[in-house]
């Protein structure tokens, strides 16, 4: 997220969305609030035209920046092969949400065993948490710089970005964000 908007632009956007800066990076929440504020600021509904223009320009700039980060990640990521995860159903649509793809099985796939997966003890585990953690480690080895939140959607990047401790509560909020994220953003699941 540090490659998307300048600090001032990010503050302006979060003020227009009426969200605290601690929510910066929670894209599903920001999207929901953007839609609410569009209705509130719309000039035809009695809103402030200048606020609407600024909100639209900042939000569209954020969307374009996030898309370019995702596209850059797709170009950089030669560490995943289709033989690792093969998809031939509707989940091949990269714009579907992770939660829509996994449906009722999401809870079973997000993490297999808390005590084992949270510390990375089982290197063979194929839960979403462990796959994203392995992706994070591989990316770090290849590019010699740690990926950050939005470049990487692993639980570790989420915690470090928002300065959260390891806890069931932070894990719950992370899994809600992953549930509402496009599958293309968490691309190792598809490759």
Curated annotation (Swiss-Prot):
Classification via Gene3D superfamilies: DnaJ domain (1.10.287.110), Small t-antigen, unique domain (1.20.120.1860)
Family annotation (Pfam families): Papo_T_antigen
Any single Gene Ontology cellular-component annotation: host cell cytoplasm
Modified residues (N-acetylmethionine): 1
Entry keyword set: Acetylation, Activator, Early protein, Host cytoplasm, Host nucleus, Host-virus interaction, Metal-binding, Oncogene, Phosphoprotein, Transcription, Transcription regulation, Zinc, Zinc-finger
Domain J, first and last residues per copy: 12-80
Major subcellular location class: host cell
Zn finger limits (C4-type): 117-130
Transmembrane segments: none
Example GO molecular function: zinc ion binding
Keyword Iron recorded: no
Family matches, as InterPro entries: DnaJ_domain (IPR001623), J_dom_sf (IPR036869), Papo_T_antigen (IPR003354), Papo_T_antigensf (IPR036092)
Domain notes: The common region of ST and LT proteins comprises the J domain. This domain is essential for multiple viral activities, including virion assembly, viral DNA replication, transformation and transcriptional activation. This domain is also required for cyclin A-transactivating activity of ST.
Subunit-structure text: Interacts with host PPP2R1A; the interaction inhibits PP2A activity.
UniProt function note: Promotes efficient viral genome replication by accelerating both G1 and S phase progression of the cell cycle. Inhibits host PP2A by binding to the A subunit, thereby displacing lower affinity regulatory B subunit. Inactivation of PP2A in turn results in the transactivation of cyclin A and cyclin D1 promoters. Late during the infection cycle, ST may induce dephosphorylation of host MTOR, leading to the inhibition of cap-dependent translation. May establish and maintain high levels of viral genomes during persistent infection in cell culture.
Protein name: Small t antigen
Organism encoding this protein: KI polyomavirus (isolate Stockholm 350) (KIPyV)
């Amino acid at each position: 997220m540090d490659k998307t908007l300048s600090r001032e632009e990010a503050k302006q956007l979060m003020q227009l969305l009426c969200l605290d800066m601690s929510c910066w990076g929670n894209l599903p929440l920001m999207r929901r609030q953007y839609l609410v504020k569009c209705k509130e600021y719309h000039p035809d509904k009695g809103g402030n035209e200048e606020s609407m223009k600024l909100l639209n320009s900042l939000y569209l700039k954020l969307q374009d920046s996030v898309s370019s980060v995702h596209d850059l990640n797709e170009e950089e990521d030669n560490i995943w092969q289709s033989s690792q995860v093969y998809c031939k159903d509707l989940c091949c649509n990269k714009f579907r949400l992770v939660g829509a793809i996994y449906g009722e099985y999401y809870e079973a796939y997000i993490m297999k065993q808390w005590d084992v997966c949270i510390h990375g003890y089982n290197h063979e585990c194929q839960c979403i948490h462990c796959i994203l953690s392995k992706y994070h480690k591989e990316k770090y080895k290849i590019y010699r710089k740690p990926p950050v939140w939005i470049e990487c959607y692993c639980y570790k990047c989420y915690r470090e970005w928002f300065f959260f401790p390891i806890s069931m509560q932070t894990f719950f909020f992370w899994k809600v964000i992953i549930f509402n994220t496009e599958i293309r953003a968490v691309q190792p699941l598809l490759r």
